[in-house]
Amino acid sequence: MTHVLVLSRNYPNSVFPSLGLWAERLVQAAAPVADCTVVAPVPWAPPLLRLRSAQRFRAVPAAERGVGGVPVIHPRVMALPGTRLHGLDARMQFPSVRAVAEQVHRERPVDLIHAHFIYPEGVMAARLGRRWQVPVVTSEHALWLPWLDQWPAVRRQVVLAAPNIARVLAVSRAVQDTIHAILGPEAHTGLLPNAVDEQVFRAPAPGEHRDTNQILFVGAVRHVKGLDVLVRALAALAHERPALRVLVLGEAFYGQWRRDEDAVKRLCHEVGVADRVIFEGRATPERVAAAMRSSAALVVPGRRESFSAVAIEALASGTPVVATRCGGPEDFLSEVTGTLVPPEDPAALAAGIRSVLDRGEPFDPAALHRIAVTGFGMGVTTSRVEMLYREILAGGGRR
């Protein structure tokens, strides 16, 4: 069976179990057609550094087995705090990644490298692929613009690496458009959306309770995710829906994310909805799925979203989605599955929530589940991955 080296900083581990679940699901989907070894770098934390984040990074094991017994290796890499030296990430991390990858390749030759994100993973993967003479593909989970316009040093590395990448895969058309804006119309790109595990995210069973006064937000509380916009929308709905509340499921991994979360909590007090926004913190996929089935709607209020895996998970759970037109959700959301509204507009978001909650003809949970599984289930994703790997290994897709 094809041996694939998966390179991704974002991958679940025993300390951060919800980190990069979308990468893990693609590995699960690939399991019937490929043997994957995952290299998931972790920031090196000096022994005397007592920050909570440093202690957690140190607790990540050097190697472990992921879902399905997939070997996951965690080399320690140099990672400076903040983004000031972002352009040096690939250079600083490559020695540690190369050492581990070379050992994997010696023990069993790698046939293909699949990196998640073009930088730094894709840039490092391109160097390994050139060294081993094996093809490289990258999955792109972020919009390249305005990011690469803001980081010219990173942009140069991406453009230089691109000729050594057989296929640059986007999770949505919005991401694909930004890739072509950087690499040109001739770039070999493709679409490989995120997958949903329909065994976890199932439609509600007959008689399963749904709380019509609960709407759900799932994800890290980062400014770009727009929870502040949802809080203002909730305040706008307060007089007509005094019982409506928001359940927030998600963990702030990093310092800036925690500061963003604190800012949202202050906003909740300022606009008078602190008692109706419940921050539950980290949640397992099973807890998220249960909350989706029991909520009236999932709200995705993002300023920018490359895909929105949680929206697909909600549909698979039989729950409609209110989302902003922020990039990825436009590929699969419509009036059949919920509604789309402009970003950064609390009044429009409130109107969208109102329209979904007040819909005359209720959404059919079984129909929403079918839509999600048909387009993004594990079975269809396995077929996509198999076709992709077969084509790449046959020599297709070179720029």
Language model segments and positions:
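Conserved acidic donor-binding segment of nucleotide-sugar-dependent glycosyltransferases
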Residues: 334-346, 355-361
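Conserved donor-binding/catalytic core segment of Leloir-type glycosyltransferases
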Residues: 5, 207-225, 231-234, 247-249
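A conserved nucleotide-sugar
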Residues: 227, 231-278, 286
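Aromatic "clamp/platform" in nucleotide-sugar-dependent glycosyltransferases that forms part
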Residues: 303
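A conserved mid-protein helix/loop that constitutes part of the nucleotide-sugar donor-binding site
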Residues: 21, 123, 217-236, 259-262, ...
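Short hydrophobic beta-strand element within catalytic cores of glycosyltransferases
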Residues: 320-323
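Short alpha-helical donor nucleotide-sugar binding micro-motif in glycosyltransferases
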Residues: 282, 290-295
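Carbohydrate-associated surface elements
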Residues: 174, 195
